[in-house]
Design a protein with these regions (language model features):
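Active-site-proximal helix-loop-helix substrate-binding element of RNase H-like nuclease domains
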Residues: 48, 101-129, 249-252, 273-314
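A short beta-strand-to-loop transition that corresponds to the Sensor-1 phosphate-sensing loop
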Residues: 4-8, 79-82, 98, 305-309
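Non-catalytic, usually N-terminal nucleic-acid engagement modules in DNA/RNA processing proteins
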Residues: 1-2, 6, 13
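Generic beta-sheet signal
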Residues: 1, 73-75, 266-268, 301-304
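Short, active-site-adjacent cap segments at secondary-structure transitions
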Residues: 9-13, 57, 83-86, 276-277, ...
Length: 314
């Protein structure tokens, strides 16, 4: 098992196209701050994390998938990025995390499932992006050619090489022909940007990715983070961990909140069955559940929540 991460540095794609991923919102700091914790957990749990300067996580996945195929192994890629569908093959399956009707689901793609869904082969997914671009990555594509037109063109002609070699012969509206001709350079640039690199300079020895036994520090690490449900799922006994005392057990005087005005901006909330505590402006306040209910329903106040499902049922 390999867990691939992006680095917060430019990649070879930025060198080819300076506007690559331009305008994308920065990753929220509350998420960024959790990456070191996640990586430490993965390390202690026996998994190998992989990062590569100048390359993206997709390139790492593509390189490892090809290496697995070449060594007569099968590969499963778990991702939320549709770009990885170009890596699907008889030996590589993609498990795509998606949301349907507000509920999460995992869709498994092999070549047959991919063709059933999109009517395209894995290599044709790259050609599709060459024409329609990708707004999320700021890949330009051909101006004026959307997903519907691009899908029709690739379904009939399979790749942009054929399209441009036969630009005067292909069966399209003249307006589409003009757009294709005008956007040729961007089409080829977009194909290059959208193609996952399968030769990133990383360790491809499959034996180095065998899951190792849990480190003895894993149990106390998880207990400190109060990952008790996950520990139970993993068969890790909480008794084996020296659990740090909860904040409520620390000798600390909690001041009762008297007025709503004491809570300003973003807050952190801790709740048990009978009471709650709020951290605001580096001060901890104790309050009753009726007050906390009003606080949590206040859309103006930003909250950070763990185990939201349990809280929402109360």
């Amino acid at each position: 098992v390999a867990v691939a991460f992006d680095l917060n540095t430019p990649t070879f794609r930025h060198k080819k196209y300076v506007q690559y991923k331009a305008g994308r919102h920065k990753t929220p700091m509350e998420l960024v701050s959790q990456f070191p914790i996640l990586k430490e957990w993965l390390k202690l749990a026996g998994y190998k994390c992989v990062e590569c300067e100048g390359y993206e996580a997709d390139d790492i996945l593509g390189t490892l998938a090809l290496s697995a195929e070449n060594s007569e192994n099968t590969c499963v890629i778990a991702t939320g990025d549709r770009d990885s569908l170009q890596l699907v093959s008889d030996k590589t399956r993609v498990l795509l995390a998606a949301t349907k009707m507000g509920k999460p689901e995992i869709i498994s793609y092999d070549p047959a499932a991919l063709f059933e869904k999109y009517g395209l082969t894995p290599p044709e997914m790259i050609e599709l992006k060459a024409l329609m671009g990708d707004a999320s990555d700021h890949i330009p594509g051909v101006a004026g050619v959307g997903e519907k037109t691009a899908t029709d063109l690739i379904t009939r002609y399979h790749d942009i090489d054929y399209i441009y070699k036969n630009i005067d012969k292909i069966d399209v509206k003249e307006s589409v022909r003009a757009k294709l001709a005008a956007g040729k350079d961007f089409a080829y640039l977009s194909r290059e940007l959208g193609t996952i690199c399968r030769y990133a300079p990383i360790d491809t020895d499959m034996s180095d990715y065998v899951i190792r036994p849990h480190d003895s520090r894993l149990a106390p690490f998880m207990a400190q983070l109060e990952f008790f449900k996950l520990m139970e799922k993993m068969g890790i006994s909480a008794d084996s961990a020296a659990v740090a005392p909860k904040a409520a057990a620390v000798n600390r005087k909690l001041t009762v909140i008297q007025e709503n005005s004491l809570v300003d901006g973003r807050i952190t909330v801790w709740i048990d069955d009978n009471s709650a505590a709020v951290v605001s402006n580096n001060k901890c306040f104790k309050c009753d559940l009726e007050y906390i209910k009003a606080l949590l329903t206040d859309k103006v106040v930003e909250k950070y929540v763990y185990d939201y499902k349990s809280i929402s049922k109360r």
